[in-house]
Each structure stands twice: as C-alpha cells, then as structure tokens.
C-alpha cells in the first residue's frame, strides 16, 4: 500500500534544509520504491493553512545536497498565533487538518526549530501523524546534541571574526561582533572560541559592562592595541536580567540603540576606555549559502532516519543526535523547551582557562 508523505520547512532558513529533504526523499525511494509519494507543503505552516502544496517527483530532489535555502520555501508562522482567529476568520488548526486530509497524507515531516516543533506537537495532539527534524543555527532544540545548520553557521561566524581581527589590529579598535542567538549562546560561544574572541557575551550569562571594559583595559596594558567582543544578539546585562523581557526591550528601544545590546556595549566601551569602538553585524549571512561537509552528513543521517520512522510508522517524535547516535524523542517531551548553554559547559571552562572574559 502506498504511503503519501508530506514535507514542510518552517521558520528561519538555514544551511542543510535541502540536504535533509534530499536525505528523506532518497531514503524513502530506496526503501519503498513506487510505494511512496512525496508531497511538498510550500512556505511552511502557511502552506498547510492555505492548502498550498504540490506533488513531488524523484527529479525534484536531485542536485540539492549542496544548495542553501529550501526548495519548498519557508515562512514564520508563530506558534502563539496558531489558535488565534484573526481578521480573515480562519481557524488555522482546522485548516491545517483539512489540508492534511485533502492531500491524503499518511504522515507529515516538519523541518524546523523550536516554534516549528511546538506546532508539530500541537498537530500530533490533534491526531495527525507527525515527525519532526531539528533545524536551527542556534543549536537550541531540547533533547538533541546538535541541529543541522549549526556547524555551517559556526564556520561563517568564525570567518567574520577572523576577518575582523585584521581590521581591528590595523586601526587599534575594539570590535563588537553581533552573532545570532536570541535565547541560547551556542553559536556565539563556538564561533567566539574558534575565532579567538577576547570577550564572549551570552544570553545565559548576564554581563557587567564594567567587567567588560576592565577586560579591554587589561589587554591594552599587556600591549594589545585591539580587542574582539563576540556578542550574542540575546545578551543582556545584570540589570536587565532582573526585568521582564518586554520591559528591557522597551527600555532599549527608548534609548534608540536597537533591540540588541551590541550598540550599547560599543558605546559604553568607547566612553569608558577611550578606545575607538565599532560594531559589525553579519546578520542573515549566518543563515545563507551551502552547508558544510559536516552539516551535509548530519542532514543525510537525520533525513534517512526520518525515512525509517515513516516506514515503521513511528509518529509523534522528532529526530535527535544523542551521544553520537541518531535517535528520536517524543515531541511532547521536547516541545516548548530550550537547550541553553549550561553553567557547567566544558567550553565555558575552556574559555576561562584561556583568559577569555565572559562579562
């Protein structure tokens, strides 16, 4: 009996989405041959809501291993809005269930991050056959040691830090580099260590601006004419850590320095140390381009494992890597949870041993 398998990509794009789609498809065709049909849901959950999907053929999955982005398109559809009926009077959950039924799907694979997994769990609870695949450059999905897209983003952010070193040294500047990661600092921590940042500021560890400035001044006294500060976009100071998120975000907006801490840190460092300070924001560059060799392998592992789950009809789960082994977690166990950098993380110990300031 034929199985009809839906695939969607949701949330922010990242390297490895197409490689994972390919891994799923090639493994399904290899294992099930003509007994599988693949349906592409376009533009994430938006396509599932609006009934926007297309029949896929084996040809659609050729030549996409190295391709960045996603051939299915993606869109952010916040989980908090899934049960909210807006001006268009569309019941989103009912609409998604209808599309699933209209497309005659036997199961749906959802590739995405934390928000995607929350909606995937919701659909699973509503009775749909769902399998998740963990995608995010933030590496913050609970229950898996790594997500596809993360290692490529580390490579990109590291190259930015590498290149900033030469201009910082040439101009005797402090350079603040803003790295993606709103709730978790994995990307900043890894790229900061790999790129030789002198100060690394993470969302999990509220910083004291005086300690940041002291670290810059210590380097200057030891003969260094520049410093590199890697700042996670979700970094906050000790005062903000005591406040509700919406309150400190509003306070930042009122100050006219943007919603991230980077500009304010740069301004304070220049004022307190007297050293010329600049900000570099690589932004969406960290999401773009071809996946690294590591992410291609990981995506293929995850995709082929998801195909196995389809074949054995194991639903309500998401793929994970735990202690070097590809496995699965129940969606209900991981949805709505964030994998943060723990205080006991070995890389934090490494950073401290190396004299890196953590704020």
What do these predicted regions represent?
Residues 99, 110-112, 120-122, 129, ...:
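Accessory alpha-helical/coil subdomains and C-terminal extensions
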Residues 302-311:
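Flexible loop/turn connectors
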Residues 12-15, 87, 114, 144-152, ...:
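Alpha-helix capping and helix-loop boundary segments enriched in small/acidic/polar residues
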Residues 25-58, 126-163:
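Glycine/threonine-rich beta-strand-loop-alpha-helix active-site module
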Residues 1-9, 20-104, 115, 237-242, ...:
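A cross-family phosphate/adenosyl-ligand binding-site feature
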Residues 10-13, 41-46, 76-77, 113-116, ...:
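Short, ordered loop/turn segments at secondary-structure junctions
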Residues 14-24, 48-49, 93-94, 105-121, ...:
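Short glycine/serine/threonine-rich phosphate/pyrophosphate-binding segments
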């Amino acid at each position: 009996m034929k199985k009809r398998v839906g695939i969607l990509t949701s949330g922010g794009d990242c390297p490895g989405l197409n490689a994972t789609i390919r891994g799923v498809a090639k493994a399904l065709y290899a294992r099930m041959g003509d007994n599988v049909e693949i349906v592409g849901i376009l533009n994430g959950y938006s396509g599932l809501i609006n009934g926007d999907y297309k029949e896929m053929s084996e040809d659609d999955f050729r030549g996409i291993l190295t391709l960045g982005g996603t051939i299915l398109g993606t869109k952010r559809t916040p989980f908090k809005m899934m049960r909210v009926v807006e001006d268009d009077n569309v019941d989103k959950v009912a609409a998604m269930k209808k599309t699933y039924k209209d497309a005659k799907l036997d199961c749906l694979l959802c590739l995405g991050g934390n928000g995607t997994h929350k909606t995937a769990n919701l659909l699973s609870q509503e009775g749909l056959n769902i399998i998740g695949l963990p995608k995010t450059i933030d590496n913050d999905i609970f229950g898996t040691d790594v997500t596809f897209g993360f290692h490529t983003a580390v490579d990109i952010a590291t190259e930015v830090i590498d290149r900033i070193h030469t201009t910082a040294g040439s101009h005797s500047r402090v350079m603040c580099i803003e790295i993606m990661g709103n709730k978790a600092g994995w990307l900043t921590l890894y790229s900061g260590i790999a790129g030789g940042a002198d100060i690394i500021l993470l969302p999990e560890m509220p910083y004291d601006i005086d300690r940041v400035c002291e670290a810059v001044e210590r380097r200057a006294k030891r003969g260094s004419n520049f410093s590199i500060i890697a700042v996670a976009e979700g970094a906050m100071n000790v005062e903000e850590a005591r406040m509700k998120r919406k309150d400190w975000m509003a306070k930042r907006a009122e100050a006219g320095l943007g919603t991230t801490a980077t500009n304010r840190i740069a301004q304070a460092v220049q004022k307190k140390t007297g050293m010329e300070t600049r900000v570099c924001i690589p932004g969406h560059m960290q999401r773009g381009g071809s996946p690294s060799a590591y992410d291609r392998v990981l995506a293929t592992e995850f995709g082929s494992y998801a195909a196995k789950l389809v074949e054995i009809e194991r639903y309500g789960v998401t793929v994970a890597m735990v202690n070097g082994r590809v496995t699965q977690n129940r969606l209900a166990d991981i949805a709505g949870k964030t994998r943060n950098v723990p205080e006991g993380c070995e890389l934090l110990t490494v950073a401290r041993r190396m004299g890196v300031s953590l704020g």
